[in-house]
């Protein structure tokens, strides 16, 4: 993909997304605490793209136990080896246990992984690693990604795409921009169903895909936040574990 064409796509995508809003995919109800919650109807994605294959026995998965519930993601270590090594090492060390979600943008992302210093760390004495990108993985709704700083490097911060499905986040104008930028037809089709943020492709690392508990991610995404987009009431990561799918 030509860099100039990609840069033009990113700019246009950002302009398109400023006009996106919640719509017919949202249904209102009451949570156990009496607060209003929104159930998002997320359609099954029929696609040969890697992220939409149900995990097979032996696949590597991450289990996130949070105060809002449990969600699970299949990981792709061979597609982002440094990101996986760092994430798995931090999980083994218990780094994420007890941390809270530090940034929530409803209909966009839920983010965690910052330490007390607000910067995060790595298993390499805090030394960051470059973002790993591939045409095999994209920022569809439900993708598990590593945060990237202004220098294009990553540490412990991760986020899950909480974008709305279909044209609620991927408009026809954005589809046209993807086609102009040279996206594969299969990827465009998957974005049209799942929703997502293609303007983050080839800049941020995609490590995995949530396959169970997306309703929990959606609940986190609806938390009331302060002026810094931090949940007003802590949403805590009780534990993260890495295991094999059975």
Task: For every predicted segment, state its role.
Residues 2, 19-246:
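Cyclophilin-like peptidyl-prolyl cis-trans isomerases
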Residues 1-18:
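Sec-dependent bacterial lipoprotein signal peptides
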